[in-house]
């Protein structure tokens, strides 16, 4: 009997980016929400200043710290992805971030804020994965809460 199969998986919400340069922020919103800090992209965009060119890994680590998420950047091979604590963030295509939600010896599933959920074989993922991952875990200062900016339809009229 596999005891890990009895462990409840965290549900990771899919959050799509609305601008090309906010994939990193969208990934942080997904991971934070999976850990119980239910937030959205608009709230994080207002709370954390971002460059028009997007976020670097270092900037994502700073924001994660401010949100109460312990983080560590790792360099690893594709075959080592199943060893990561998920959900975590992967550096993708040299200029993009995705959230890894599942990995085994044959395939991975990522939430790509540009296109949605994707399941890829390791061979298919190989040209995209840069070898850098960011593991994130709640600290004692992490707050489980809902923090979403309401959208007011009156601004459209």
Locations of regions flagged by a protein language model:
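Membrane-integrated ABC transporters
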Residues: 1-157
